């Protein structure tokens, strides 16, 4: 809420949310957007539901939190294929870290194309080349296929990739009040 407030936006102003996957560090605070349409990867949503509802021990849930998965939102839209979300915004499937994971490709007039792969690839070091398996991986084969897909998309669009967990890389990004156009 505090970050949105810095740009004059309230959670209720947001009508569409895209969750890359349902791990706690991405789905946390989804309760602030109960009024929104929430896009989530179908395979990950179903896997997370299974994890939290079939085993009562949270220590075995692997990054999924029951409270996040049970939030009643306006509508969950389960994604299982690539598509255009809005003009200039594409949703792409990048599984591996989790059974399903989605990223965004954002085409900007001034700053060009930016790819937000989220936990498909944590850092520049993991991206390589060569790509390196790291962190939590549900399916290592799908992980490496997703990295190759990212490389093709990066080349196709001459895109900049924003790594979701690369703290050194974060220092190079614009922050509020600056923004990308």
Where are these regions (language model features)?
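Cap/insert and terminal regions of metallo-dependent hydrolase folds
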Residues: 103-181
């Amino acid at each position: 809420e505090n970050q949105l407030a810095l740009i004059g936006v309230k959670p209720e102003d947001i009508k569409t949310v895209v969750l890359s996957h349902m791990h706690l560090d991405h789905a946390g605070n989804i309760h602030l957007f109960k009024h929104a349409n929430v896009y989530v990867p179908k395979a990950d949503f179903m896997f997370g539901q299974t994890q939290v509802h079939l085993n009562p021990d949270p220590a075995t849930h692997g990054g999924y939190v029951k409270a996040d998965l049970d939030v009643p939102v306006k509508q969950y839209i389960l994604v299982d294929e690539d598509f255009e979300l809005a003009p200039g915004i594409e949703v792409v499937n990048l599984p591996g870290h989790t059974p399903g994971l989605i990223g965004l490709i954002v085409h900007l007039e001034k700053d060009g194309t930016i790819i937000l792969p989220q936990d498909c690839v944590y850092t520049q070091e993991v991206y390589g080349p060569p790509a390196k398996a790291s962190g939590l991986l549900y399916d290592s084969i799908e992980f490496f296929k997703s990295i190759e897909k990212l490389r093709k998309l990066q080349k196709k669009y001459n895109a900049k990739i924003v790594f979701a967990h690369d703290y050194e890389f974060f220092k190079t990004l614009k922050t509020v009040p600056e923004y990308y156009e």
